[in-house]
């Protein structure tokens, strides 16, 4: 127990909760897909969102969103994950990075190419 004088000198540190704990303070993490499937979003929206269950090198098993139209990710694919939730999918707090490791970039993508790992099209 600190004294009142110690608390005046330096206040207690607030515990900061991270939004992506599985990354363990790293910008990205590598992982292996254990299951690739589609799921439906929350109430006002309707779609089949592509997600994957990923076992990370940090030991966590998380659900990650596969962005873009079409993908080549299957079970045992090695993928790179970044933080970032999907608002209408509960429990999905990570995104798979397209165009790295086993995740190919989106085909025929002309705009926002860097977000989807697409190469510059030939003129």
UniProtKB/Swiss-Prot annotation:
Transmembrane segments: none annotated. InterPro entries: NA-bd_OB-fold (IPR012340), Ribosomal_uS12 (IPR006032), Ribosomal_uS12_bac (IPR005679). One of its GO terms (molecular function) is rRNA binding. PROSITE patterns: RIBOSOMAL_S12. Gene3D superfamilies: Nucleic acid-binding proteins. Residues 103-123 are annotated as: Disordered. The keyword Ubl conjugation does not apply. The keyword Oxidoreductase does not apply. Pfam families: Ribosom_S12_S23. Residues 107-123 have a biased composition (Basic residues). It is found in: Plastid, Chloroplast. Keywords: Chloroplast, Plastid, Ribonucleoprotein, Ribosomal protein, RNA-binding, rRNA-binding. One of its GO terms (cellular component) is small ribosomal subunit. One of its GO terms (biological process) is translation. With S4 and S5 plays an important role in translational accuracy. Located at the interface of the 30S and 50S subunits. Belongs to the universal ribosomal protein uS12 family. Part of the 30S ribosomal subunit. This is Small ribosomal subunit protein uS12c. It comes from Guillardia theta (Cryptophyte).
């Amino acid at each position: 127990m600190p004294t009142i004088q110690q608390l005046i000198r330096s206040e207690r540190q607030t515990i900061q909760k991270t939004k992506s704990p599985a990354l363990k303070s790293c910008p990205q993490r590598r992982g292996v897909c254990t299951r690739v499937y589609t799921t439906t979003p929350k109430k006002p929206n309707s779609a089949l969102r592509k997600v994957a269950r990923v076992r990370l090198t940090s030991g966590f098993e998380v659900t990650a969103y596969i962005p873009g139209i079409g993908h080549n990710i299957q079970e045992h694919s090695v993928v790179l994950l970044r933080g970032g939730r999907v608002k209408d999918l509960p429990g999905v707090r990570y995104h798979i990075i397209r165009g790295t490791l086993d995740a190919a970039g989106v085909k025929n993508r002309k705009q926002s190419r860097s977000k989807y790992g697409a190469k510059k099209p030939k003129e």
